[in-house]
Amino acid sequence: MINIVSLVCIYINSVPYSSIFFLDKLPEAYAFLNPIVDIMPVIPLFFFLLAFVWQAAVSFR
């Protein structure tokens, strides 16, 4: 139980700092990758949805 509480506290303390990374811009040499970088945070959601599509295809065995 203490581990869960400590993980929640660590997450809450890191939230203000994680938003800093979203405000940064890529260096000019990597500016052509901006569209890919914008989509990257959504990629894990595609895997999550793929699991449901896969289960629906096998009739939720």
From Swiss-Prot:
Membrane topology (UniProt): Single-pass membrane protein
Highest taxon, organism lineage: Eukaryota
Main location (coarse class): plastid
GO cellular component terms, semicolon-separated: chloroplast thylakoid membrane; photosystem II reaction center
Pfam annotation, one family: PsbK
GO terms under biological process: photosynthesis
Propeptide position ranges: 1-24
Alphabetic keyword roster: Chloroplast, Membrane, Photosynthesis, Photosystem II, Plastid, Reaction center, Thylakoid, Transmembrane, Transmembrane helix
Subcellular location: Plastid, Chloroplast thylakoid membrane
Chain segments annotated as transmembrane: 36-56
The protein's role, per its UniProt record: One of the components of the core complex of photosystem II (PSII). PSII is a light-driven water:plastoquinone oxidoreductase that uses light energy to abstract electrons from H(2)O, generating O(2) and a proton gradient subsequently used for ATP formation. It consists of a core antenna complex that captures photons, and an electron transfer chain that converts photonic excitation into a charge separation.
Subunit-structure text: PSII is composed of 1 copy each of membrane proteins PsbA, PsbB, PsbC, PsbD, PsbE, PsbF, PsbH, PsbI, PsbJ, PsbK, PsbL, PsbM, PsbT, PsbX, PsbY, PsbZ, Psb30/Ycf12, at least 3 peripheral proteins of the oxygen-evolving complex and a large number of cofactors. It forms dimeric complexes.
Entry-linked HAMAP family: PSII_PsbK
NCBIfam families: PRK02553.1
Protein family per UniProt: Belongs to the PsbK family.
Protein name per UniProt: Photosystem II reaction center protein K
Species name: Lotus japonicus
Biological classification of the source: Eukaryota, Viridiplantae, Streptophyta, Embryophyta, Tracheophyta
